[in-house]
Amino acid sequence: NSIQGHKYLATIYEKEEKYELALEEYEKTYELNQEEKGIYLKIGKLYGNIGREKEAIQILGELLKKKPDYYEASMILADILNSKKEFKEAVQVYMNALKYRPADYDLYYNLGMTYTLLNDFAKAKECYEKAAQINSVLYHARYSLGQINLLYGDLEEAEKYFMECIEAEEVESGAYYYLARIAMIKGETEKAKNYANIAIEENPTLYDKMADENIFMPIIDEVNKPRLSVDGKKKNKRKTLSKKEMFIDLYLDNTCKIVGKLNNNDIEMMENVKKTKQQTINLDNEIEKE
């Protein structure tokens, strides 16, 4: 019945993802010592994990009322609000937290993701840019900037950001995939094939994705199909991303296709391919005449 005993059990249950059992033990711990804010924070987080968001929001709100600069409480509360699709409320939580940590990468990055889900891409872009300025080693903000610039149809800016991302393992394959798309839009089919081959080598699942997209139709038969080794497909390096990051990537990718400039540029891309082929035919004809 000791505090340490309950806390120890709670930690084990939490690691095993037995959240309801962990919650019981943390609540027993808190009953014995209500001065531990860290335990109350754990209780709030676990309420969120088991789908009792109302209780979670209440607890985290209480903690922030007493201590407005409680960073961990802000991050957990915003995550729960995002999961409930209460994006405007999540934005407010991040904005309040930024008053106390104005140069925090994670706050700007997460705020950018929330603005993305609000379809406020201009503000999302600002937040990702600030995050990228704060920490130049973490590449995912720049990756998102590449996607947003594609959405706006700014191919040069998008290409710049994706080129910066090719050294980062967690977003490398995706960066090459988008570089291949940009090359196709520009009518640079050879460059597109090279980028596509690297993307598929890094992440074999991208082959099927490309095969299903009209933009890659002119080159899909000329890129390398993924090869399976004895141990199966090459490990996808993007596994280091969180579920939230992967969801945002997919969301931006789909948004580009639905409302962005990529679909509009498919026609331009096809025209560029036709022009390139026509130029080749004309050149061949000139050679034959000579």
Indicate residue ranges for each PLM-predicted region:
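Helix-start (N-cap) detector for alpha-helical repeat units in TPR-like alpha-solenoids
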Residues: 3-4, 37-38, 71-72, 105-106, ...
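Canonical tetratricopeptide repeat
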Residues: 8, 42, 76, 110, ...
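Register position in tetratricopeptide repeats
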Residues: 15, 49-50, 83-84, 117-118, ...
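TPR/TPR-like (Sel1-like) alpha-helical repeat modules
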Residues: 181-208
